[in-house]
């Protein structure tokens, strides 16, 4: 038959283990869920803040062009003369040169700046074209592109002029490679219209690396990164994929990303997908120029904090269980020790051994039930000794 000591130890340990297990399990489930949500929120905020930074860069460009546009329209006092007088056009161009030059020099990343006129009533090389090879060099004025050499439908060479004119509003062009200097550029162009008639355009070409360097400097968790696409999933910038390729063509798992880009309700929300066999999560935000900035990371990295927290809770629970076993064992021995001593006294009494044991004296001083039992047993032994005597 099991002793009271064993029963007490087992009871204490079982109760402690059950409570520790239940509390630990609840803590792990809730903490893991909360930690994963925190990782998602961190990723969403990172996506928004990075998008805002890119938008700020674009706004600096658009503000520069819009300032030149406002001055250009204000100085265009006689639109009719602009159509018929070469001298008027030349004078106007000279007035705009220092204004365009100053604006271009003060715009970070600007490589070209231009004011071009409608080739239907001006010379095919009319206007201004400022260019430089990199952001550290000075702008120089060169002869503008000869419109007579290209058909208006030639998007590659003169799309930067005709597309904004056809749109009838300010337009961000998609990034393109300037083969002359081997640099990817992105353009912001505003058409000039007076009384509903197209006069020309004003625009700037910005070194696209100003944007991509910012994206490359971004990191999230261990291997998360950002990239740019347009609304249809065409790659504008990606560290692994070729510019101009489509996400859906790169990996079938990316079709869900393309689908999400066309759904406004998914913007700034977590979108799960697979890429190269890995489960990933992405957030995206639409930029000022219509491009989409995407921030992506492996799902396992979002769950890493959850796993670490679960390990800590599990480790704490395991330590608590071990400590409980030790404390339960010590308490069991402590609680049952006086009972064991009283049991020994009872056995001595049954064998009529009435000799006093100094080791049992402390039992009489106890204030609990064992103390009262010891005193009662002492009195009984005393009476038995008198009877035997």
Q: Which residue stretches match the model-derived regions?
A:
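Juxtamembrane extracytoplasmic/periplasmic/luminal helical "stalk" adjacent to the first N-terminal
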Residues: 6-10, 15-91
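Short regulatory alpha-helical segment in sensory/regulatory domains of signaling proteins that mediates
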Residues: 55, 73, 100-108, 215-221, ...
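Conserved beta-strands of PAS-like sensory domains
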Residues: 181-217, 281-283, 292-301, 305
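Intrinsic low-complexity, intrinsically disordered coil/linker regions enriched in small/polar
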Residues: 210-293
